[in-house]
Amino acid sequence: MIIGIGTDILQIERLQAAYDRTNGRLAEKVLGPDEMLVFKHRLARNHKRGIAFLATRFAAKEAFSKAIGLGMHMPMTWRSLQTLNEPSGKPITSYLGALAQFMAEKNWEAHITVSDEQDMAIAHVIVTQK
């Protein structure tokens, strides 16, 4: 059964401006620990691809918060939802702290997809009952 659906789209340039304005602290505020490792690696290899990664993860968190119907209110926090990738490249969600407990208690799971193209990043999330 579908619990909720969320979508978010953003201009990568706007996220880049916020990242620059905060001297990179935006990534520390938004990304979970595993996402941060991937971000740093990608940013070091190719700055543009690193920022695109940050943008897709930002969009994923916004879309997820809409799908669960809470917005950015506890137990949903920026860092408590991580979007990681299976070896095949398929994006998957990982929950930390109170959000992990919330999702387990509700018996919910999230199905997520993220994409970026030149100047835009998008995420789509469907939350279902397990």
UniProtKB/Swiss-Prot annotation:
<dbReference type="Pfam" id="PF01648">
    <property type="entry name" value="ACPS"/>
</dbReference>
<keyword id="KW-0963">Cytoplasm</keyword>
<dbReference type="InterPro" id="IPR004568">
    <property type="entry name" value="Ppantetheine-prot_Trfase_dom"/>
</dbReference>
<comment type="similarity">
    <text>Belongs to the P-Pant transferase superfamily. AcpS family.</text>
</comment>
<dbReference type="GO" id="GO:0006633">
    <property type="term" value="P:fatty acid biosynthetic process"/>
</dbReference>
<protein>
    <recommendedName>
        <fullName>Holo-[acyl-carrier-protein] synthase</fullName>
        <ecNumber>2.7.8.7</ecNumber>
    </recommendedName>
</protein>
<keyword id="KW-0443">Lipid metabolism</keyword>
<comment type="function">
    <text>Transfers the 4'-phosphopantetheine moiety from coenzyme A to a Ser of acyl-carrier-protein.</text>
</comment>
<dbReference type="InterPro" id="IPR037143">
    <property type="entry name" value="4-PPantetheinyl_Trfase_dom_sf"/>
</dbReference>
<dbReference type="InterPro" id="IPR002582">
    <property type="entry name" value="ACPS"/>
</dbReference>
<dbReference type="GO" id="GO:0000287">
    <property type="term" value="F:magnesium ion binding"/>
</dbReference>
<dbReference type="GO" id="GO:0008897">
    <property type="term" value="F:holo-[acyl-carrier-protein] synthase activity"/>
</dbReference>
<feature type="binding site">
    <location>
        <position position="8"/>
    </location>
    <ligand>
        <name>Mg(2+)</name>
    </ligand>
</feature>
<keyword id="KW-0808">Transferase</keyword>
<keyword id="KW-0479">Metal-binding</keyword>
<keyword id="KW-0276">Fatty acid metabolism</keyword>
<feature type="binding site">
    <location>
        <position position="62"/>
    </location>
    <ligand>
        <name>Mg(2+)</name>
    </ligand>
</feature>
<dbReference type="InterPro" id="IPR008278">
    <property type="entry name" value="4-PPantetheinyl_Trfase_dom"/>
</dbReference>
<keyword id="KW-0275">Fatty acid biosynthesis</keyword>
<dbReference type="GO" id="GO:0005737">
    <property type="term" value="C:cytoplasm"/>
</dbReference>
<keyword id="KW-0444">Lipid biosynthesis</keyword>
<keyword id="KW-0460">Magnesium</keyword>
